[in-house]
């Protein structure tokens, strides 16, 4: 491969970083030339980036004597250069991206940020000499502060190397705790990411960083509390395994899931009469009515409604809400995001609603009984959790614990095939949809008028390679796909979105 060292961002700000290009073809031991497996390589890219960042921190600590703050997502600010105003003054690209989102009336979201990065991307200036750029940076608003900081640095390159030992390296339990805080199952690369994040400057020499990380990963995966959840195959017998195909979990994660299943499947006999839920032409299909009668009349503490996009979730929950109200029940809506929570009352699927974070704020030290009392939950409460696939496992457990203490019922609504919780272990919805005997799924798609398009949406949802290809072929045949430059397509999409929203449509 070839490594390129860059010192600036596309906007000409100081931004030291590296690019590595690997040849797609490699000469193998048997003399044959083969292509690299791009999927496996891509899977390892983030872990490699974390090791790179840890190595850079170590080099800067030795060569310049700088200290670093807490590591967040693999990166850490230099202590003394972590003033937000200083960072912002040298972050022209970030300001350009924020300004583009503001100019287009878009809220700050990662998806919009990625679009803005592409649309506002400029050609990098490679003509201006580094000396001229450094002079320009020194004259900037915070240039004097930076010069003063640099002048006070004392290099550590002559200091004796610190011995590597248990006192200076993260323990396997620390690494695994950091991993499972974000995911229920994980790969070797996931463990490598966290191991590199947790290595403090001064503990490992730059030359030994990679081998040290590999050793920490071996130790973490070799603990008694780590379980393999996929069959292990010998590379000598089967060399077709891709990186990341081997998945692991921990005893703590399994125990948490089992506890959630035990609570959800407890028989509480809080079901109510659901005779009022009947099919209505154009509003509620027979299958939707059957599903809601099963949910409303269920004797289990929890119910699950698997609801793919466009399957009539709102109209179904409206019917259930009416039946609960007729039985004297109060329906509380919970959701992982404010946007999802806000529409629950407006769409008449709940009597009140809030985010899960707001519901449980300030309750960390309370017992489930006290939390239930604080929220006003009791035997006449039905808690409907929307977008449940995006709810973390710990939050799901808290909802179940509180409902159990209150004698309330819980209904989890969502699609296990859609996005999971952000940076938090999840997957409980999928598990409960299999474990609850009366879990229901809304299988009909109503959002699209064209029957073929409804079927294509199901193929995309499943995510299997063959099904995705079938969906893409359908979209291509029916002129749903348009080609062009990334910028042009994004501009067209944004223009279409503006036109729809200006007309009061959902887009």
Predicted features along the sequence, with ranges:
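Conserved P-loop NTPase motor core of helicases/translocases
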Residues: 330-402, 431-434, 443-446, 453-483
């Amino acid at each position: 491969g070839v490594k390129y060292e860059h010192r600036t961002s596309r906007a000409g700000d100081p931004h030291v970083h590296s690019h590595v290009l690997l040849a797609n073809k490699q000469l193998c031991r048997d003399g044959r030339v083969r292509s690299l497996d791009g999927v496996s390589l891509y899977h390892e890219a983030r872990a490699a980036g974390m090791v790179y960042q840890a190595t850079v921190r170590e080099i800067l600590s030795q060569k310049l004597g700088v200290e670093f703050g807490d590591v967040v997502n693999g990166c850490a600010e230099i202590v003394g250069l972590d003033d937000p105003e200083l960072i912002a003054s040298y972050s022209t690209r970030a300001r350009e991206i924020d300004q583009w989102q503001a100019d287009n009336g878009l809220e700050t979201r990662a998806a919009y940020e990625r679009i803005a990065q592409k649309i506002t991307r400029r050609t990098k200036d490679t003509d201006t000499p580094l000396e001229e750029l450094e002079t320009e940076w020194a004259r900037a608003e915070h240039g004097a502060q930076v010069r003063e900081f640099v002048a006070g640095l004392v290099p550590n390159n002559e200091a004796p190397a610190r011995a590597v030992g248990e006192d200076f390296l993260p323990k396997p339990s620390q690494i695994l705790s950091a991993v499972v805080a974000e995911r229920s199952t994980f790969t070797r690369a996931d463990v490598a990411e966290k191991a590199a994040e947790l290595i403090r400057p001064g503990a490992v020499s730059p030359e030994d960083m990679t081998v040290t990380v590999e050793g920490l990963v071996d130790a973490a995966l070799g603990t008694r509390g780590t379980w393999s959840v996929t069959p292990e195959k010998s590379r000598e017998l089967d060399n077709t395994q891709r990186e990341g195909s081997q998945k692991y979990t921990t005893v703590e994660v399994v125990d948490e899931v089992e506890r959630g299943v035990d609570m959800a499947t407890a028989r509480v006999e809080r079901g109510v009469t659901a005779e009022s839920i009947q099919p209505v032409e154009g509003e509620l299909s027979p299958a939707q009515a059957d599903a809601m009668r099963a949910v409303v009349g269920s004797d289990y503490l929890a119910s699950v409604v698997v609801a793919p996009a466009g399957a009539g979730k709102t109209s179904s929950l409206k019917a259930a809400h009416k039946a609960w109200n007729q039985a004297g029940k109060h329906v509380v809506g919970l959701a992982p995001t404010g946007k999802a929570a806000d529409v629950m009352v407006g769409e008449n699927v709940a009597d009140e609603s809030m985010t899960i974070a707001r519901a449980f704020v300030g309750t960390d030290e309370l017992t489930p009984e006290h939390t239930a009392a604080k929220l006003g939950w009791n035997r006449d409460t039905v808690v409907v959790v929307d977008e449940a696939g995006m709810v973390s496992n710990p939050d799901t457990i808290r909802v179940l614990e509180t409902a159990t203490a209150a004698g309330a019922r819980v209904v989890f609504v969502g699609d296990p095939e859609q996005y999971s919780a952000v940076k938090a272990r999840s997957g409980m919805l999928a598990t409960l949809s299999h474990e609850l005997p009366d879990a229901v799924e809304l299988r009909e798609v109503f959002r699209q008028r064209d029957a073929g398009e409804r079927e294509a949406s199901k193929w995309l949802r499943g995510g299997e390679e063959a099904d995705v290809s079938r969906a893409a072929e359908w979209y291509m045949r029916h002129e749903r796909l348009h080609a062009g430059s990334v910028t042009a397509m994004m501009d067209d999409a944004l223009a279409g979105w503006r036109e729809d929203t200006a007309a009061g449509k959902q887009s």
